[in-house]
Regions:
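A bilobed periplasmic-binding-protein/Venus flytrap-type ligand-binding module shared by bacterial periplasmic
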Residues: 75-87, 106
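Periplasmic-binding protein-like
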Residues: 97-120
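Ligand-binding pocket segment of bilobal, Venus flytrap-like solute-binding proteins
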Residues: 1-66
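Solvent-exposed loop/turn segments at secondary-structure junctions
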Residues: 43-46, 71-73, 86, 100-101
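Short helix-loop capping/hinge motifs at secondary-structure junctions, enriched
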Residues: 1-3, 85-91
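Extracellular/periplasmic catalytic domains that process cell-envelope and extracellular macromolecules
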Residues: 31-32, 58-60, 72-74, 86-89
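Solvent-exposed, polar/charged alpha-helical surfaces in well-ordered, non-transmembrane soluble domains
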Residues: 9, 24, 28, 32, ...
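An extracytoplasmic/periplasmic, membrane-proximal ligand-sensing/linker region
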Residues: 115-158
């Protein structure tokens, strides 16, 4: 935890602005020169680059470059069927559809999030190049979440 505490303190001390309410204003701040770097979910930049957020944001997004840490953390979107489901068969069919080539391709194109591996990707995403995904399980991240939040609070993260 000592190295983690040092990293958190360094992040807090290096903030050019208070923590932003979401990733879009943070990306705008980088594009406008208020910040030199930001850690953001990539799909926010994808929406801006595709013009989903309007022409002003599309223009601003052209001033931002994606750099992948090595390795990079990857958020996942998941689904499941609980024992309490009143219609587990339909719920299972929905999950199967959502993981199909058709749904994943549409989701990537509409939202600029990475689809399941091997399914057609959005041109915006392809332009950013490959990345090396961190080999940490979602289960392990969940196990460490409370400790991480405690370390953040104890070291000035707000």
């Amino acid at each position: 935890p000592a190295a983690t505490e040092d990293w958190i303190k360094g992040m807090v001390n290096n903030l050019a602005e208070p923590v932003f309410s979401s990733d879009t204003p943070m990306i705008r701040a980088v594009a406008q020169g208020q910040c030199g770097v930001a850690l953001a979910n990539s799909y926010y930049l994808g929406r801006m680059q595709a013009g989903d957020k309007g022409e002003a944001d599309k223009t601003l997004s052209g001033k931002v470059t994606v750099r992948w840490p090595d390795p990079v953390h990857v958020n996942i979107t998941g689904g499941g069927v609980t024992r309490a489901s009143r219609n587990p068969e339909a719920a299972q069919r929905l999950l199967e559809f959502l993981s199909s080539d058709q749904a994943q391709g549409g989701y990537a194109a509409a939202n600029h999030e990475y689809p399941l591996k091997g399914i057609g990707e959005d041109p915006v995403l392809q332009a950013w190049g490959p990345f090396n995904q961190a080999k940490v399980s979602a289960e392990r991240l969940g196990e460490l979440n409370a400790q991480a939040l405690e370390l953040m609070a104890a070291n000035g993260w707000q």
